[in-house]
C-alpha cells in the first residue's frame, strides 16, 4: 500500500468532505471515504481493520447516539497526513452529549487508509454510564462498541 502525499489543497478538500459527511449520521457517506483495508484506531474501540469491520463499528456507534454529528474546528497537514480537530455531539439518554477529538488520517488513492482518533474517553464513559435512560441502548450496543 502506497500512502498518498498531502498538500494544503488536498487537506482542505478532505476537511470539507469530512465535515459534510459528519453533518448527519449517514453510514453510506462515511463508507465512501474509506479504502477497502482501512484501519481505524480510537480509545474506546481499539483497532478495527477493514471496511466491513468499520461499517459494523460505526453502525453500533450510530445506534448508541442516533443523531451523532460533528463540527470541525481546524485542519492541518503534514507531508502524508491530515489532522482534523472537531467536536462530536448528539443525544444520549435524553440529554446532550459531546466530546472533542483530533483525528489523524493517511490516504491511499484518495481514500482513508488509516484513521487514528485521539480523545479522552473518561468523561464520555462517565456520561454514558451516568444516564439511566440510555442504559438499554448502551447494553445493546455498548459491549460490542467498546470491545477490543
Predicted regions and their residues:
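A solvent-exposed, acidic/Ser-Thr-rich amphipathic alpha-helical stretch
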Residues: 27-79
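A short hydrophobic beta-strand element
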Residues: 79-88
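Short, low-complexity N-terminal intrinsically disordered segments enriched in polar/charged residues
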Residues: 1-32, 135-148
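Short beta-strand edge/turn micro-motifs at domain boundaries
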Residues: 103-129, 135-137
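Short beta-strand segments enriched in hydrophobic/aromatic residues
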Residues: 34, 88-90, 119
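Short, cysteine-centered beta-strand-loop-beta hairpins and adjacent loop/turn segments enriched
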Residues: 63-64, 89-98
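Short, surface-exposed coil-to-beta transition loops
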Residues: 69-70, 97-103
Amino acid at each position: 500500500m502506497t500512502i498518498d502525499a498531502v498538500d494544503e489543497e488536498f487537506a482542505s478538500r478532505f476537511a470539507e468532505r469530512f465535515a459534510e459527511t459528519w453533518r448527519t449520521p449517514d453510514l453510506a457517506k462515511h463508507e465512501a471515504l474509506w479504502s477497502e483495508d482501512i484501519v481505524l484506531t480510537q480509545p474506546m474501540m481499539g483497532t478495527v481493520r477493514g471496511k466491513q469491520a468499520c461499517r459494523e463499528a460505526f453502525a453500533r456507534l450510530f445506534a448508541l447516539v442516533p443523531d451523532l454529528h460533528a463540527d470541525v474546528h481546524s485542519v492541518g497537514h503534514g507531508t502524508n497526513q491530515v489532522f482534523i480537530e472537531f467536536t462530536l455531539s448528539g443525544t444520549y439518554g435524553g440529554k446532550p452529549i459531546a466530546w472533542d477529538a483530533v483525528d489523524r488520517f493517511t490516504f491511499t488513492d484518495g481514500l482513508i487508509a488509516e484513521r487514528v482518533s485521539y480523545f479522552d474517553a473518561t468523561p464520555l464513559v462517565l456520561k454514558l454510564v451516568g444516564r439511566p435512560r440510555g442504559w438499554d441502548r448502551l447494553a445493546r450496543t455498548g459491549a460490542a462498541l467498546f470491545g477490543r
